[in-house]
Amino acid sequence: MTEIFRSEKDGFPLVGLRSEVVEISIVPALGARVFSLFNRRTRREWMWSASEKRKLFPNAFGDAFEQGTLTGADECIPTILPCRWKGRDLPDHGEVWSRSWQLDEKDLAAEKLTTSVTLPLTPFLLTRTISLNNADLRFDYQLESKAPESEPFLWSWHPLLCFEDGDYFELPSPTEDLKVEIALNPTGARGETWPVERLRQMAGSQDGFLKAFVPAGNGKAALVHGKTKERLELSWNPDQLPWLGIWITRGGWNGYHHAALEPTHGAPDALDVAVEQWRAHATLACGETTHWHMNIHLTE
């Protein structure tokens, strides 16, 4: 049985779904971010926050992402890093994380969290539907183009996940190498290839960070809590989302300790580089609509 609930945090309405195992809540007014992903049986909160009180506040369109609440999981589209594309100054972490999304009350009555947003610069309409079945979540996405011509884009799920000493990733099979976006301690530059062992070393660091990409492989990845072996498992269709972004900071970025697994259409994080150099991106034709999905499973 799935229960619908509403609450409020710092003046912002939250809406969520609850099963015997999982509780998830979102903030429609703040990018429809996933505020909390909570295992009710183990009492583990998977979503990290920069603020001990998980404080929420609004941001202006175009703000740097690190000026935001840094809480939970955001949607990033059509870029992650800021860049200029087709005469548009695309903002840091995309166009929708700082925007208010529309909640579909009819779908909510049917135990679905459906929210939608029109991008301010790129002529797209993005709709996301979250459904819950016991310990399993499904995120369904629909992207509709209102553009007069084809538009390349990147979409990435952008969760900030709690990460502690002893925690570790399980990456898609097969994964042998990482394609670096940026790294510190050790330093790495965009396009470098690192052995996957470097990720394990970074997880044990106290002063580094790493953003890298791997091919989606079998479309499965997980974050494992080292002490309890609890797992957050992601699965997706690698034909739809052929890359996985990996982010980890062990004190190297603003002193924070968190991690992310980011299924995505392409790489690296800047749309212009993804199109012109790496040639790893998606494209939506004039008037076209596309769909993709992602699954999350929480284990004890």
Could you describe each region identified by the protein language model?
Residues M1-R138, K146-L154, H158-E300:
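Surface-exposed acidic/polar loop and edge beta-strand patches at domain peripheries
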